[in-house]
Amino acid sequence: MQSKFIVIEGLDGAGKSTAISFVRKYLEKNNLAAIYTREPGGTKIAEELRNLVLHNKYDEEIHSDSELLMIYAGRVQHYRNLIAPALEKGINVVSDRFYWSSMAYQGGGRGVELSKIRALNDNFLNGCEPDLVIYLDIDPILGLQRAQKVGSPDRIEKAGLEFFNRTRKVFKDLVKDLDNAIEIDAAKSIQEVEKQIYLILDKHFNFQN
């Protein structure tokens, strides 16, 4: 079976980590080897860039274009040093976020032109597209409430409600436009979300469990 690149997307507080635990459980049950990773981050250099973007300790503004380029510098490291080699070896890759998050957060939220983001993807990631994107949709107010229970808000989580409304809109537009994406209502119970994820994976891997 050809290796798969699966991405979990959604606003902060949507439950991506929980969803990934369900994907892990499913793949392990079906004896499918996989690595689990995240963005921003995924490699040592990418994690350093993540820390700079989310927890800027310097008395200097990070401009929207700079934020995008730092995230993409980390993404190139992540893709070339971890994602692509694993897929070439026949190992499935499951990632908490990928380039959709840049389209939504930097494009929708910050207002960076989406064409710039697509160009970065085409030029530096060979136009890489996940085999499957599971988008967890949640109202930004509920998502931020959930995120605040986990810990102190990071730099992006402090961006405000309108920022997240714009971000959500781009996520939902992407789901409508792409055949490899499925939306789940993340406000539903954990049990219902788990059930839906298993059904999606059954169909994707052509399994009948």
From Swiss-Prot:
Keywords: ATP-binding, Kinase, Nucleotide biosynthesis, Nucleotide-binding, Transferase
This protein's record includes keyword Transmembrane: no
PROSITE patterns attached to this UniProt entry: THYMIDYLATE_KINASE
Gene Ontology molecular function terms on file: ATP binding; dTMP kinase activity
SUPFAM superfamilies: P-loop containing nucleoside triphosphate hydrolases
Catalytic reaction equation(s): dTMP + ATP = dTDP + ADP
Annotated positions binding ATP: G10, L11, D12, G13, A14, G15, K16, S17
Cellular component, GO, one term: cytosol
Enzyme class name: transferase
Disulfide bonds, paired cysteine numbers: none
Gene3D superfamilies: P-loop containing nucleotide triphosphate hydrolases (3.40.50.300)
EC number annotated for this UniProt entry: 2.7.4.9
Function: Phosphorylation of dTMP to form dTDP in both de novo and salvage pathways of dTTP synthesis.
Family to which the UniProt record says this protein belongs: Belongs to the thymidylate kinase family.
UniProt protein name: Thymidylate kinase
Source organism per UniProt: Francisella tularensis subsp. holarctica (strain LVS)
Encoding gene, per UniProt annotation: tmk
